[in-house]
Amino acid sequence: MVTEFIFLGLSDSQELQTFLFMLFFVFYGGIVFGNLLIVITVVSDSHLHSPMYFLLANLSLIDLSLSSVTAPKMITDFFSQRKVISFKGCLVQIFLLHFFGGSEMVILIAMGFDRYIAICKPLHYTTIMCGNACVGIMAVTWGIGFLHSVSQLAFAVHLLFCGPNEVDSFYCDLPRVIKLACTDTYRLDIMVIANSGVLTVCSFVLLIISYTIILMTIQHRPLDKSSKALSTLTAHITVVLLFFGPCVFIYAWPFPIKSLDKFLAVFYSVITPLLNPIIYTLRNKDMKTAIRQLRKWDAHSSVKF
C-alpha cells in the first residue's frame, strides 16, 4: 500500500529550480502582502465599509488561503532531494484546495450579483445588499466550498494505491492522484468532471450572462455615470477570466496536456492570487485613495512613536 506520494515538480534542472525558488518566493511574498493590504485597507477605512468591499476583502482572504495550500510546499521542495507528501497530507491538500477553490467560485458569483444589483437596480441596492445579506452570502460561500471539498475527498478516500506513487505536479489534486489508483477509474473520472467541471463551467457561464446584462445596461447610461461602473466591472471580469480560465481546462477539458496542466496549475494557484490585488487596486480610485490614507496614517504614527 502507498503511504506517500512523490511530486515530480516543475523541473529537474538544479539551475532552473534555484531560479524558480527565488521567483516563487517573491511571488508568494507579493500574494501575502497584496491580499493582506486589501483586507487591512477595507477594515481600517470607513468609506470602504460597503457590500462590494466586504466581498473583496473576503475574496482576498480566500486567494491568500488558496495559494498557501500549495505555494509554501512548492517553494521548500525546490531544494528537497525527494519531494514527498504523506497520503494523509495529500488528502488534506485536496480538501483545502477544493474548499477554497469552491468558495472562490461562489464569492465571484456573489460579487457579480452585487454589481448587477448596484448597476441594474440601484434604488433597491441598500435593501437587497444589507448587512444580514452579506453575512448570509459568506455563510453560503463557505458552506458550498465545504460541501464541494467533502465530495472531492469522498472520491479519493476509498481508492486503493498499491503501485506507482509519482504525481506529475507540485501538489495533490484529484485528477492527477486518481490516475495512480490500482482500480479502473474511468467512471470516477467522469464523476470528477461532472462535479468540478460542471460546477466550474456553469458558474462561468452564469457570470458571463450576468456581466453581459450589466454591460447592456451601462450602454444606455450617460458616459459620465457609466465610466466608474465600467471601470469596476472591467476589474471583476478580468479576475473572473483569470480564475475560471485555468479551472475550465484543468477540471472540464477531457484531453489534458501535462505541460499545459502544470502551467495552468501555477497560474491558478500562484499567478491569479498575485494579480487580483493589483487589478482591484489599479482599477479602483477608492482603493488607491484609501491605501494612500493608510500610508499617511502609518507614517504619522511612526513619527509620533
Swiss-Prot record:
One GO MF term, please? olfactory receptor activity
**Cytoplasmic topological intervals:** 43-50, 114-132, 213-228, 283-305
- List residues traversing the bilayer: 19-42, 51-72, 94-113, 133-151, 189-212, 229-251, 263-282
Protein localization: Cell membrane
User: What intrachain disulfides are recorded?
Assistant: 90-182
The UniProt keyword set, sorted, is: Cell membrane, Disulfide bond, G-protein coupled receptor, Membrane, Olfaction, Receptor, Sensory transduction, Transducer, Transmembrane, Transmembrane helix
Q: What broad class describes the main subcellular location of this protein? A: membrane
**Which segments sit on the Extracellular face?**
1-18, 73-93, 152-188, 252-262
Provide the Gene Ontology terms for cellular component. Answer: plasma membrane
Q: What does this protein do?
A: Odorant receptor.
Task: Give the similarity note.
Answer: Belongs to the G-protein coupled receptor 1 family.
Q: Give the protein's recorded name.
A: Olfactory receptor 4F5
The organism is: Homo sapiens
Q: Which gene encodes it?
A: OR4F5
